């Protein structure tokens, strides 16, 4: 089936799809203070979703394209779940968040099909994959339209990988208790086996969101990157997130000696946001298999255990947490009790001495990840490094921080 036909099949014009903001039925906190974060974007009045401009631009989206799609959503006169929130248009039609971003992705998909230059075609496919992922954001369980956008993103990503430099292999890993999970191994030019970074992404992202990390930082240093989706998302959607948050990644680590392109004696883990929860657990539970663990804006304790911190977090992010935990209609109190169990300090890990070298990067006044969480990580390691990343200028400092983290990883792998 062609990509265009797949799009037509998946996105049939129906209007009874559940609207994203209604999927998690929690009690609202009411008015919340504005939030701005380098990794998560910021809350903007009259939007349910956080607008994550930095990460979208970092992934290759033109700022003007973001504004263009937003303007189409704002101008829509279609029925909304909440008339005060622009991005709550009901049904797959003009003005609906998923519709507008998927429509934008299809423009690039058509450019990719028409382009004769393989590398440029690959760039267009990659751009389409990124836009489909934004369409599916924040990837809540039960969001039928978002899941269809994710399927298109994965197809576009596979098309891109066939045309872009280096090699990408789609891999399956066996995990007891369910179907195998799918990951992508990105390899630089040259002969393997390669030192490899196992990516542990955030809860509101897909594994295909991290190609820029591989292309700009790891590949130039001869380092491969292996990604899998976090539990309950994408290819791992049938796996519920549990307190044993690192379960999937542990099984992947244990399988690496059987992967000929990976040097299993030179592996590091890199965790963004809640992915750092996974990476730090790996540092403790799988230290013989890891040379290093790096974290960025880690969610390992405070947000999971501090009620005041949770009150500062936007509704959308709490909805993401509730969705990942399978608590779509639980009370806020029940959600708080469950989140506390995911704290690595409460679990008895953080605070104990860990032999694995660990780096943690943080931003001051980050509402999701205070400095104390990063200090807790680095002080627990026998070889810890704390990295403060200044907020402004946000893009330049984000790039500089990633360069420093990559250099630190490289020294421990190569």
UniProtKB/Swiss-Prot annotation:
InterPro entries: AB_hydrolase_fold (IPR029058), FrsA (IPR043423), FrsA-like (IPR010520), FrsA_esterase (IPR050261). It comes from the Bacteria. Its EC number is 3.1.1.1. This is Esterase FrsA. Catalyzes the hydrolysis of esters. It catalyses: a carboxylic ester + H2O = an alcohol + a carboxylate + H(+). Transmembrane segments: none annotated. NCBIfam families: PRK05077.1. The lineage of its organism: Bacteria, Pseudomonadati, Pseudomonadota, Gammaproteobacteria, Enterobacterales. The keyword Hydrolase applies. Keywords: Hydrolase, Serine esterase. It is an enzyme of class 3 (hydrolase).
């Amino acid at each position: 089936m062609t990509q265009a036909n797949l799009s037509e099949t998946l996105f049939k014009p129906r209007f009874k799809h559940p609207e994203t903001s209604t999927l998690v039925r929690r009690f609202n906190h009411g008015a919340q203070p504005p939030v701005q974060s380098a990794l998560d974007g910021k809350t903007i009045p009259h939007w349910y979703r956080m607008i994550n401009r930095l990460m979208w631009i970092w992934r290759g989206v033109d700022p003007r394209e973001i504004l263009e799609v937003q303007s189409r959503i704002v101008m829509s006169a279609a029925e909304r779940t909440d008339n005060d929130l622009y991005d709550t248009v009901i049904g797959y039609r003009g003005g609906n968040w998923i519709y507008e971003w998927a429509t934008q992705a299809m423009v690039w998909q058509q450019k990719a099909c028409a382009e004769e230059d393989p590398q440029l075609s690959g760039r267009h496919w990659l751009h389409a994959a990124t836009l489909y992922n934004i369409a599916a954001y924040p990837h809540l369980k039960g969001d039928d339209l978002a899941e269809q956008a994710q399927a298109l993103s994965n197809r576009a990503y596979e098309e891109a990988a066939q045309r872009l430099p280096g090699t990408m292999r789609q891999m399956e890993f066996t995990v007891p208790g369910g179907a195998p999970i799918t990951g992508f191994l990105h390899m630089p030019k040259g002969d393997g086996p390669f030192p490899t970074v196992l990516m542990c992404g955030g809860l509101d992202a897909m594994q295909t969101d991290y190609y820029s990390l591989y292309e700009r930082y790891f590949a130039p240093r001869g380092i491969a990157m292996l990604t899998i989706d976090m539990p309950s998302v994408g290819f791992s959607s049938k796996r519920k997130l549990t307190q044993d948050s690192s379960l999937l990644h542990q099984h992947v680590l244990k399988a690496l000696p059987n992967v000929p392109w990976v040097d299993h004696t030179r592996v590091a883990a890199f965790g963004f946001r809640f992915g750092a929860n996974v990476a730090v657990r790996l540092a403790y539970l799988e230290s013989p298999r890891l040379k290093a663990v790096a974290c960025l804006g880690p969610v390992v304790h405070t947000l999971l255990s501090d009620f005041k911190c949770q009150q500062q977090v936007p509704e959308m992010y709490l909805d993401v947490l509730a969705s990942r935990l399978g608590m779509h209609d639980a009370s806020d109190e029940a959600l708080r009790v469950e989140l506390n169990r995911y704290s690595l300090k409460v679990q008895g890990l953080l605070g104990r001495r860990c032999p694995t070298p660990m780096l943690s990067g943080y931003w001051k006044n980050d509402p999701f990840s205070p400095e104390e969480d990063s200090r807790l990580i680095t002080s627990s390691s026998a070889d810890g490094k704390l990295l403060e990343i200044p907020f402004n200028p946000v893009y330049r400092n984000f790039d500089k921080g990633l360069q420093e983290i990559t250099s630190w990883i490289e020294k421990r792998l190569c």
